[in-house]
Amino acid sequence: MNDIYRIYLSALRAFVRGSAPEPVPQEQWAALMELARINSTLGILSHVYLNHPDLTPEQLRPVLRRQCLQEAAMYAARGNQMALLAAEFDRAGIDFILFKGFVLRNFYPVPELRTYGDVDLVIRREDRAGSDELMKRLGYEPRDTWEPAYSYQRGVEYYEVHTDVMEVDVSDKADYIAYFSRIWDHTCPSQTLRLPHALEFTPEFHLLYLLTHIAKHISVSGAGIRMYLDIAFFLKRFELDWQWIAGELECLALSDFANVVFCAVEDWFGVECPLPRRSVPAEVMADFLEFTLSGGIYGYAGRDKGTVFLKQQDRSREEKVSRTRTLLHHAFPPVRNLENRYTYLQTKPWLLPAAWVHRLADSRTEWARFAGHTREILSADMDEVKKLKRLYRELGL
């Protein structure tokens, strides 16, 4: 483990456990802050070292203080805006499920330092029209408007209103879409916002979702360390039914992956999971840490998209990497990739060729995006692709 990674992990561990972080050599502060920035934890890093002024250069303290206060103020304001929006949903009689960042932030010692790009909530499919009308009436501008996630923006506020939470299968080992179609069977009254129509996932189901969500991000591009920090605080927060969780992980074919995640959470943050764990080879854990930290919050930092696209092809087989097949997949996606956007495919899959034309005719940005992806795929480092595919297998995915 290099020095920057070790110091960075010590700061996150200090945030989790209330301990002291490692000292930072003067010449390494810039690299440390950049690592925290790409992983969306700069406010946490600032908070930790401000609490230990003996470890922080005097000239750097105003910078850290400003970063910490700005982040806390912004996310406090966004939290207040979400509470107001939730009250509007409640007044309209629309049931909604809170999950991910807006719930998880409350498990952090300083909730306002848990960053998030958008706020997610789930509604019933039959409430889609009513929720869309409500969002527009409140001044939110629609962004993406196809199933199962509809996004809206107003200033710095950004919301995703879901009718489902799993639109793709993480792998071919289980039917993840079907499993997570039963989300309403695993809800309880919200402890975050105590409103009659506000719900949350039960803790056990929420943990299963978080693990699957991480696996999904890894299968696409990557998952930064903030997602594992969420798991650490989740484990500290709840007494869980681990027998039920273990059985469901088997159903989801995620037992091996969860084992790696729980080993990482213990190694990185000092938070243990009650489930019995199997040892993971040190070289796999080292590669996993490098992959997690270097790629940033969603795995794209310092990693071109062509590499990511090629990695997704035949993920379980390291030797199968074809630029041509990947290009064809992006030009002519299968039905499962388009049926949520062009819903006529759900009942008329034979209209797939029409959807290909429809997609490219939607806007000039589709052509520009495809041209950019083509350049990236043709120039991608194939050795890096094979390395990522090997790691994917070693993680149990």
Task: Describe each PLM feature range.
Residues 1-117, 123-397:
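Conserved NTP-donor binding/palm subdomain of two-metal-ion nucleotidyltransferases/polymerases, i.e.
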